Every structure is written in structure tokens, then in C-alpha cells.
């Protein structure tokens, strides 16, 4: 689960260049449009990057089609999306910067302990953005807001790995 909490990494916006209220609104509204698709989001990441799936002992080496409809998969996907939702909800408000930093720092620390690399965080980012592009109204403004949020997240996570 915590690896995909990495996903959270995709949504911060409280660091070097915090998200503006407008940027946060774009990230939040686009996330709201897909956040109920927990299983599909995680399945898209695993399909694009099987090495990420193999980081989860309960899913490692298994056919994605055989695990996608299981309770364990749905539970894990919900944990990841819920973490991301929390970070996204906090973004765009300067008074929440410390909370976002704490959450994302812990994410980095937890994933370091699991041997997750910066490259795998990058893979997760790529898969998440591809999922968003295919499932939400995606223009240059939305892309820029997500890129800024993800860049901010990586600025916290990567040094901790």
C-alpha cells in the first residue's frame, strides 16, 4: 500500500513552489473525477509497470487479471487513493504546508525502508499521469498543475529514498 501512497507523491504542492489556489483547484477537481476508480487506477499502474506490482508481496508474480477483482486488491487500492486524496485536499493552502510536508516525508521514509527507488516513483508518476490524461478533461493548464504538484512531491520524497 505504502508504495502507492507514493501516488500521493503526485499531488502535493506545498514546497519550493507551492501550488496557487487555481492550480490546486485544477488538481483537486481532476482528481475528484477519478478518485472513485481506485481499482482501475492501481490496475493501470501495475499494467504499465509490473515491477511496481512486484513490490507488493501479496501481488508479486501474480497475473493482474486474477487479482484485480479481489478484496485484497480493492482494499489496497483504496488505501493508496485515500492517501492521495488527503494530500490533494490539503494542497493549495499555505497553512497546510507543514501537514503536507509531514505526510510526504513519511511516505519517502516508509518507501526507503521497502527498497523503492526514485525511478519507481517516476514510473508511478508516468502511469498516474497517463491514467489522468485518459480519464479527465486534460489541457495544458491541468497538465501544468499536476506537473508542478508532482515536482513538489518529488522534491520531498526523492532525497529521503
Curated annotation (Swiss-Prot):
Belongs to the globin family. GO terms for molecular function: heme binding; metal ion binding; oxygen binding; oxygen carrier activity. This is Globin CTT-VIIB-10. Residues 1-16 form the signal peptide. The lineage of its organism: Eukaryota, Metazoa, Ecdysozoa, Arthropoda, Hexapoda. There are at least 12 different components in Midge globin. It comes from the Eukaryota. Keywords: Heme, Iron, Metal-binding, Oxygen transport, Signal, Transport. Homodimer. Residues 18-161 form the Globin domain. Heme b binds at residues 76, 111. GO terms for cellular component: extracellular region; hemoglobin complex. InterPro entries: Erythrocruorin, Globin, Globin-like_sf, Globin/Proto, Mb-like_M.
